[in-house]
């Protein structure tokens, strides 16, 4: 199963390697066991060196293995997943830790950094206030009321920004 995720800092700011993603990214057909989590592979800097798909590929790095810290299912919840990598991220990976806060203030603008269909990194931009919404999906799945952010992506030079399978879990 391919998804996106974000490396997030914690209040201790000690660079503990937490990954925030989407709960539905865990393949529910495969049991979430320590053995299986130790096979999860995380890619860093999986991107092109420029904005065009024909630009050269950057040197990416990987880390394998994690522990599940917390998960909130999509059905009746917010579809959240928090993982902890089994090892610290080497400094030479030049990894970026996302910040966060507990406020209820919606983002006025922002970007979604993601890997649609497992592709190299893409960036989707929004410039309208994110609004809370309830997720309604297939198979009568309904998220918790107002537990999701709804954003409208902007048009870009090559069309418009989108997300697709593999983008789930992106910041």
What are these regions (language model features)?
Residues 4, 169-170:
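Beta-propeller and closely related beta-sheet repeat lectin domains
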Residues 157-164:
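Short pre-catalytic strand/loop immediately N-terminal to key active-site residues, enriched for Gly-Thr
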């Amino acid at each position: 199963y391919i998804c996106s995720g974000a490396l997030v800092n914690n209040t201790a700011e000690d660079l503990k390697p937490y990954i925030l993603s989407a709960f539905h990214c865990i393949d529910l057909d495969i049991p979430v066991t320590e053995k299986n989590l130790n096979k999860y592979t995380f890619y860093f800097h999986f991107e092109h060196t420029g904005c065009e798909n024909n630009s050269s590929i950057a040197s990416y790095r990987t880390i394998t293995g994690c522990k599940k810290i917390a998960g909130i299912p999509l059905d009746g919840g917010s579809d959240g997943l928090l993982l902890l990598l089994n090892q610290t991220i080497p400094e030479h990976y030049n990894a970026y830790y996302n910040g966060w806060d507990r406020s209820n203030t919606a983002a006025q603008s922002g970007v979604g950094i993601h890997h649609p269909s497992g592709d190299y990194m893409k960036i989707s931009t929004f410039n309208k206030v994110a609004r809370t919404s309830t997720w309604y999906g297939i198979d009568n799945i309904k998220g918790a009321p107002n537990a999701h952010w709804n954003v409208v992506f902007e048009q870009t030079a090559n069309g418009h920004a989108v997300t697709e399978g593999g983008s789930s879990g992106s910041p």
